[in-house]
Amino acid sequence: MSEEQELDLNGEMLARREKLAKIRAMGNPFPNRFRRDAYAYALQAEYAEMAGDALKDADVQVKVVGRIMLKRVMGKASFFTIQDVSGQIQLYVARDNLAEGVYVDNVGLWDLGDIVGVCGTLFKTKTGELTVRCADVELLTKSLRPLPNKHQGLVDQEMRYRQRYLDLIANEQSRRTFVIRSQVVSGIRQFFLERGFMEVETPMLQVIPGGAAAKPFVTHHNALDVDMYLRIAPELYLKRLVVGGFERVFELNRNFRNEGVSVRHNPEFTMIEYYQAYADYHDLMDNTEQLLRKLALDILGTTAVPYGEYQFDFGQPFERITMHDAIVKYGNGIAREDLDDIEKAVEIAKKLGIEVQKSWGLGAVVNAIFEEVAEHQLIQPTFLMAHPAEISPLARRNDENPEVTDRFELFIGGREIGNGFSELNDAEDQAARFDAQVAAKDAGDDEAMFKDDDFVVALEHGLPPTAGEGLGIDRLVMIFANAPSIRDVILFPAMRHK
């Protein structure tokens, strides 16, 4: 903000405080009770197309509230546009329609951003705009700071994220985005409840962070004198519940990962994670297709979902392709047999500019090659399958090829949206894979998993054949809201301290 802009702001704030002082002298400037009986959108939907004479004959009395977004003062009368949670409606406030002195002493002190309540009758102006002719008015909240420029809106991206309340006031698209977010969350919850899943809650603070390859946030519990971690995933606790006999469970909640911030990553994010006994990863891919198709129809009314330059088709069966096949398809001449040889795979990776870590085995190298040559090519909804066992420490090995797992990742628009697999329920194999993760961590991989002996003990009691999946809510909302950044779909995203 320039020095001149700051002086203008200070001057306007001073003027508003002077108005507030006058209002205080007349009574309470922040009354606590006004009972509306109508919302702007509902009034527009029912009466906007009604002829003026018919509307006059109907004599529709309303009580509405809202924030003043536009103001036109014309001597003894004024027009205001107010905005409530549903939309906007115009007010006509005339001195002669109000009690004596109210127009000058009350309405004359209103500013953009103030919140008012009015009672009146609906009518049409000469231009045909639905309007409330006000017979009684009340200031409910005095705004001491001005709104963003009414013509430009709130265009500064950083301010939109830091002061989300202003963004929501000024930008209809932002309000729409978070309505869509609410619909996505409630739609997912309803989808699983209708299919017999039980919603559960598992610890956010964990002594051993598990369930994903990620770097955790560390904290300390003073009373127990023990380091604890904000969870990176609820997976191991949810599978304990399946061991305990709850055959269908899900949790829709927050996870935390102490990693970078980007248009796709926020350190605090929301996921749905669910587990289904006596199902395999093919069943979960079917579930996912059904879920996304239903969300698209319920929220957008179509299975053709626009996103930037793309249009995703949720109406057709999603493509299913193995990691090796994807590399061969998009790898510009990479031979399948070279992906089965560690030396040749490393050579390919280095030619692609990949920095190969000493701790990587063949599976990790192949995964890095996939991320470099194929991941961004998976635009239409695609299930990537047959991940190397090395990078899938919790997934069941494939019966025909134990070097890969019965795992899938869902990609849309070149971005990972979900991850699922048939669960590893062999306790001895799980213990060995945890040991391999510990070795990788000791070798410098700070995203390798911790060993969770208690989880191995749970598996030793018997986990039935089970499949599980996690879906990123934020990235799903990005798709349905056509939002380019994850910050656009999180109400209060992580920001550098100002």
Swiss-Prot record:
Mg(2+) 2 binds at E416. One of its GO terms (cellular component) is cytosol. One of its GO terms (molecular function) is tRNA binding. Disulfide bonds: none annotated. Pfam families: tRNA-synt_2, tRNA_anti-codon. One of its GO terms (biological process) is lysyl-tRNA aminoacylation. PANTHER family: LYSINE--TRNA LIGASE, CHLOROPLASTIC_MITOCHONDRIAL (PTHR42918:SF15), LYSYL-TRNA SYNTHETASE (PTHR42918). This is Lysine--tRNA ligase. It comes from Haemophilus ducreyi (strain 35000HP / ATCC 700724). The lineage of its organism: Bacteria, Pseudomonadati, Pseudomonadota, Gammaproteobacteria, Pasteurellales.
